[in-house]
């Protein structure tokens, strides 16, 4: 238990530079098409520059859904099209996710689906978001947890993709971080309220 606590604490205190540098600009958001059932409508593309048994992706997704830590993550090796079984979410919250996965097969791009769902289909479908499946090999998981935050190979964020434009979160459903909200409040502490106008081409859904 003590080792697990120290590993989690290390992960919390060692954020990559991208954590502070990421700005949610349009260039990071795109559209594509895939079969959504079991994968969901949203994914991040990350790139690993060298094969590694433990790769770590920092994904600043800025999600508005509640309890993202209760929803699963699916990682797909783009070059093979196969799912990666060895996946371990390190830290999941609405602002970002830190995910470790096995990239020993090859370097290159990986899809990270972060809102996978199952639907019953039909005119009144029931949709559920399954929790993280425990498919990781126990030995890999132990190695993964023993790897210090600074020693895992960092996967670089390429961009986010949605299933077509209708499902895109950008820009109106990309949340502000707690730090950004507090900075806005502090900069306008002498004002009774703030009015933030937006172009009508960006409706609130």
Enumerate the language-model features and the residues they cover.
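Positively charged n-region of N-terminal signal peptides that target proteins for export
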Residues: 1-4
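Bacterial N-terminal signal peptides
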Residues: 7-16
């Amino acid at each position: 238990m003590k080792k697990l606590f120290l590993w989690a604490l290390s992960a919390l205190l060692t954020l990559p530079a991208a954590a502070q540098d990421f700005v949610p600009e349009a260039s990071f958001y795109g559209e594509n098409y895939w079969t959504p059932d079991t994968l969901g409508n949203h994914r991040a593309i990350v790139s690993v520059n060298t094969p590694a048994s433990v790769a770590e992706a920092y994904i600043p997704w800025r999600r508005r859904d509640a309890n993202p830590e209760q929803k699963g993550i699916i990682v797909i090796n783009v070059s093979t099209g196969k799912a990666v079984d060895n996946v371990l979410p390190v830290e999941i919250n609405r602002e970002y996710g830190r995910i470790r996965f096995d990239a020993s097969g090859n370097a290159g791009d990986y899809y990270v689906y972060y809102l996978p769902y199952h639907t019953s289909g039909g005119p009144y479908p029931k949709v559920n978001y399954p929790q993280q499946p425990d498919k990781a090999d126990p030995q890999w998981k132990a190695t993964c947890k023993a790897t210090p935050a600074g020693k895992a190979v960092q996967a670089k964020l390429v961009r986010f993709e949605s299933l077509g434009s209708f499902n895109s979160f950008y820009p109106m459903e990309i949340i502000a971080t707690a730090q950004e909200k507090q900075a806005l409040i502090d900069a306008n502490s002498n004002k009774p309220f703030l009015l933030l106008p937006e172009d009508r081409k960006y409706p609130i859904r």
